[in-house]
Amino acid sequence: MSCEHNSIRRVWRDWRIEMHIEPGIVDGAKIALSYATAAGAVTYAVKETFADLRASNFASYAARALIATFGVLVFFEVLPHFPVGVSEVHFILGSTLFLVLGAAPAAFGLAAGLLIQGAFFAPIDLPQYAINLTTLLVPLFALHALANRIIAPKTAYIDLKYSQVLALSAAYQGGVVAWVAFWAFYGQGFGAANVASVFSFGAAYMLVVLIEPIADLAVLYAAKSLRGFERAGLFTARLFNAA
């Protein structure tokens, strides 16, 4: 029975998703930089939260933040992934969270989901929490800024074109890859092996860039049937309405 239990634990360990920079890639005094970058990301997230609260209400924000947190845990722990180079290739669906729930709830969900995952499923990742938080949040805010530029104010998110969704998804995933590369080079330098690991990770991540826009469009298409729930406060107002 013990052998069977250990086997199940090994399978779970091998298949669960760990969104992280591998422990040891950035360590010692160098990890202090991540505290500063994470603090900046959290500060901006707080600013976005107050903006969201002014546009909606606390109940709506709290509901969307909880939905985002649950979604992130599902993305991290259930969806398939595979290790490549300095990290793992998997589906974060950051652009999906943004389009459906809004920037602030998405940021809360990513931060809370990452923390819960580290606390209960992967304690070895907790020392890298600030690194991983930066890696997930900064691209989200860049995505938000891009959305404000490429989406007309009169366009609801459910009416986005594939080219717009692709641009948003590529911006987020590209940002994640860029931050992973930064931390890897910052922590381990530009040795041939490290450069090869970073490039193999970036190349493999192109699979995500191809798939996630399709997932976003599918979610937005499904959301069209939920117009009757737009006043329930479970979605960002921009999902169904113009700015």
Name each model-derived stretch.
Residues H20-T96:
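Hydrophobic transmembrane alpha-helices
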Residues V46, G71, F75-L79, L97, ...:
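Alpha-helical membrane-inserting segments
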Residues V26, K30-S34, S60, R64-A68, ...:
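Alpha-helical transmembrane segments of integral membrane proteins
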Residues S34-T43, S95-A107, L137-A145, Y205-L217:
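Hydrophobic cores of alpha-helical transmembrane segments in multi-pass inner/ER membrane proteins
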Residues F75-L140:
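Alpha-helical membrane segments and adjacent membrane-interface helices in multi-pass membrane proteins
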Residues M19-A32, R149-F235:
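Membrane-embedded alpha-helical hairpins and interfacial helices in multi-pass inner-membrane proteins
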Residues M1-E18:
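Short, Lys/Arg-enriched N-terminal segments with co-localized hydrophobic residues
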Residues T37-T49, A119, D125, N132-A178:
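Short helix-perturbing small/polar motifs within transmembrane alpha-helices
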